[in-house]
Swiss-Prot record:
This is Tubulin polyglutamylase TTLL5. Residues 631-641, 960-973, 1217-1230, 1258-1299 have a biased composition (Polar residues). Residues 850-864 have a biased composition (Basic and acidic residues). Mg(2+) 2 binds at residues 366, 368. It is found in: Cell projection, Cilium; Cytoplasm, Cytoskeleton, Cilium basal body; Nucleus; Cytoplasm. It comes from Chlorocebus aethiops (Green monkey). The flexible c-MTBD (cationic microtubule binding domain) region mediates binding to microtubules. It is positively charged and becomes ordered when bound to microtubules: it interacts with a negatively charged patch on tubulin. The presence of positive charges in the c-MTBD region is essential for proper binding. Arg-186 is the main determinant for regioselectivity, which segregates between initiases and elongases in all tubulin--tyrosine ligase family. A glutamine residue at this position is found in elongases TTLL6, TTLL9, TTLL11, TTLL13, TTLL10 and favors glutamate-chain elongation, whereas an arginine residue is found in initiases TTLL2, TTLL4, TTLL5, TTLL3, TTLL8 and favors initiation. The record marks 186 as: Essential for specifying initiation versus elongation step of the polyglutamylase activity. Belongs to the tubulin--tyrosine ligase family.
Amino acid sequence: MPVVMARDLEETASSSEDEEVISQEDHPCIMWTGGCRRIPVLVFHADAILTKDNNIRVIGERYHLSYKIVRTDSRLVRSILTAHGFHEVHPSSTDYNLMWTGSHLKPFLLRTLSEAQKVNHFPRSYELTRKDRLYKNIIRMQHTHGFKAFHILPQTFLLPAEYAEFCNSYSKDRGPWIVKPVASSRGRGVYLINNPNQISLEENILVSRYINNPLLIDDFKFDVRLYVLVTSYDPLVIYLYEEGLARFATVRYDQGAKNIRNQFMHLTNYSVNKKSGDYVSCDDPEVEDYGNKWSMSAMLRYLKQEGRDTTALMAHVEDLIIKTIISAELAIATACKTFVPHRSSCFELYGFDVLIDATLKPWLLEVNLSPSLACDAPLDLKIKASMISDMFTVVGFVCQDPAQRASTRPIYPTFESSRRNPFQKPQRPLPAQFHSSEPKQRSRPLSASDAEMKNLVGSAREKGPGKLGGSVLGLSMEEIKVLRRVKEENDRRGGFIRIFPTSETWEIYGSYLEHKTSMNYMLATRLFQDRMTADGAPELKIEGLNSKAKLHAALYERKLLSLEVRKRRRRSSRLRAMRPKYPVITQPAEMNVKTETESEEEEEVALDNEDEEQEASQEESAGFLRENQAKDTPSLTTLVENTPKENSVKVREWSKKGERCCKLETQELEPKFNLMQVLQDNGNLSKVQARIAFSTYLQHVQIRLMKDSGGQTFSASWAAKEDEQMELVVRFLKRASNNLQQSLRMVLPSRRLALLERRRILAHQLGDFIIVYNKETEQMAEKKSKKKVEEEEEDGVNMENFQEFIRQASEAELEEVLTFYTQKNKSASVFLGTHSKSSKNNNSYSDSGAKGDHPETVMEEAKMKPPKQQQTTEIHSDKLSRFTTSAEKEAKLVYTSSSSTPFSGPTATLQKIPNTHLSSVTTSDLSPGPGHHSSLSQIPSAIPSMPHQPTILLNTVSASASPSLHPGTQNIPSPAGLPRCRSGSHTIGSFSSFQSAAHIYSQKLSRPSSAKAGSCYLNKHHSGIAKTQQEGEDASLYSKRYNQSMVTAELQRLAEKQAARQYSPSSHINLLTQQVTNLNLATGIINRSSASTPPTLQPIISPSGPTWLVQSDPQAPENHSSPPRSRSLQTGGFAWEGEVENNVYSKATGVVPQHKYHPTAGSYQLHFALQQLEQQKLQSRQLLDQSRARHQAIFGSQTLPNSNLWTMNNGAGCRISSATASGQKPTTLPQKAVPPPSSCASLVPKPPPNHKQVLRRATSQRASKGSSAYAQLNGLQSSLNPAASVPITSSTDPAHTKR
């Protein structure tokens, strides 16, 4: 085959190459030609443009086949050639196999063609395609053979030369006439007249009598486009494609003179009518009789239904085509003899436009040189793609690299090795049926010299029937080549029908041929030797002519197969060719094909009806063929008697070895139980029967997986298809195993493994699934028998018949039954299952040979399995280390994945978080009240081994919590799972302005609304905070840590810097950006410092900012009244709430905002902010003085008892310490600072009109609501500038930050 033939002849023959030759002997794209069948010719497939099959491309690519397109653009031709491995070369290149051009060729180009090169035009084809030349040729034939013999054109005149004759004829009949340019197409320049004065005589035109009685379908005029292929003019060989196009006008036909100018009524050209608003196009290629373009076969079927004689009509059409081409045969054949060096170099596809009148007489309108191959509708693609592919196959492209052609003489395929040693070549391998018994031999093509030298030698041996039709004695080598080429063309004709020469048409039209050469006569006498020697009665000849016409009519009327059907058939044939070869016996082989190609049957179950409809007409035509050729072909009994005795011996031997096959054949003769028929007759299967049928179907799939995993070599397309099938089985096992009541561990094969290994593993896993599935089916049957619920006898079919059907049914039959059962019962849950037990936790998937869990499996487990205490603890202990490296990433996940409704519950939020990190978090009770801190005391016993990593996870989860929660009411989710909050609108503690800011952010910036109040999740590692601190510690720890004078001096200096930045109009917008940066850095320091701190001393960061939690008495009720000292502290932290808001925003979006959010110009917030802008400038200095006085009062009179020290690097190297009081009520400071004028005693929170102004108000308002200890630390942190450090380290070196 071609893959082997491309190698040099000097290669040593090996068994691997012999197997390759044998395996590719029946390649779908190769047909062997020549005297000894040594020349490969490419076979084209129309469906290749859909499949892009590499198996089809490999031949063209191996031989470097090429083409060039000149002066035209045909996308269809380019697509078909490219799909078959051709590559396009430059129009000026001389290395090509095909030149497709849209115009006539120059003589010097024709003379340079080699025998392997082909062009799509003959010289002087304009003798047919120019209207004036066609008219002259027909007139000449009428003068020679009589007017009636060639009356195929309407009465025509060539103007202005015949203007007088036209006027004379018009005076006798004043009907309408049609004017056409002599060299135009697509209806350009065509118009109707009813007076000679309307004609312009400035250029040559053709005037023809208008056929005013056309055949109408639904009152619309139409014509027929026929595709005619001529492969040779000497001898003349004409083919007509079995399918064409019927093109309809868009306006109903009316003979009235008033509509003579309406081209949409009188012209049927597609180029004209597509511009009409009434043009209707059909988008379904299988519907051929709808719209303004039908298939010719659909038109003939319609006429046949109307009682018209379509057989006579198509016989007249063939007569018209043959006479038209014969009229130009002399001129074109003479030009070919003069300019074309090889008889097979040229071919031509003509487009015949034929109009049928009311008497079913066809009239020739015109012949098109290059018929349109545009595919504007699916019907065009189906017809034209099939026609072009069959045309290329008939023409016969020899598989030869065009760059290796010899320049001295015409050649057949030539290879370098053949030219070096043309006389030493191995023999071609024997036919496939002898491979098992005869030695294997290699195949190589002939070189040019070998092909010509062996033509006569090979032809002398071809004297039997089926070769060249008898003896070739007396024929020259050229005549033998021509005879063989014509026979081989007819063997691969596809959808083309040879209408000349045939035994009938030669007798009728042979005398019309004007090119007097011996080739036509030789061809006729050699092709139809039996017909020529038999001098039968005229009645027999007429009967034979009628039978041939009926056969052709049946072929014209049959529906053309669609490209999809062709693709499926070719794929099925490839599967049959890939199966192992068995001894010569048909019956067992067919049974084997059935089992081997069950996957193909599954895909074609729904399309069988379509194929049957399309094959009906083909069977009808085959019936005609059998009837008509019954007299000329031997009978079936004769063929059986003439079969070799070896076959019968092999059949007997095979039957002895395969008694099982014979038993199956005898069983098939018995009437089978048709379960499908029972179901269609309102029968139904029971649940147990449905599961049994489904289990049997799965067993068939398992057997197919195990059987096909043998040591065979399969193609890439087969591997891709099997990979897709295995992927379907894998997906089924993943989902169906979760529906089993019994746990089943599935070890699914990795895609990295080899294909056969994956099939083996998958078959094993499917077998395990079937075993568990059958056990559950048995349990279901036992339960029903115990309960005495006889559903099987009431609803199901007879059990014995059902078991018989199960034993004999194929995979396709079971699939059909299960599909019908599913459609009938509207569900497949009976045999697939719908749910799994909640206690099942052992169904897990592992990918053998792959790293990590399967993503789909993990997601399905996350969706289907609720977290439990054991699983949660295990996962958390395994995955907790990841929190230390991805704290901020998970903080973003919490924000972007949270629920859009407040207090929607942690479950809705945590479903979006990766289960490898947060699968342990469950719902918690969010009810307020002092009794809820009892859950905090349970945490140490639940997680005793996790004292560290407290604040990192806290930053992740607490960022979405409510900032106003009282420490005593914080709820920590535990692995055991706490009850869900009952009320979706429940509020905890007092609200601050943070809720309003978060609400505005969620509305204005389209951020997830998880930042609203009520989404509180805290880390479970802070259980030690619930314990009360020991009282009586020395208060001197605080005085040792802080130097009063240093703090006062530093605070005064930094307060001035803060005022310069915070109260200047230029830095008004960038304030929150600076605070967010400081907050993020401070949070990181808290995380690092907490790692070395005992669990009982670790802080809980308030959601409103990185403050420190004051340990108060757990039983103390909420303090809704704030002392004056607390209020004074809060007024100093007016910018802290904005910092918290931007912290929330930066974590939610992952981007630190460059400026604070500004409301739109039309909102009330903006108007209010503009009014307050001037007031802020006036109040800035007053607020600065108040801040200084407040800070001095704090450090002058503050005494903090029993303190716990905390160190924090805040911003640019700031280290501060704060004390947390515990075991007693917070101490208050005297009120020394006057609150801002805008502060009020009590105000309900609402969306702030301006952030800065409202933050100042909200800060003073919150002072009367929050706890005093809470307020002290908030005020302390808000008053400190990020550039300060205590002890005083005012350096801005980044090293301080990292320390």
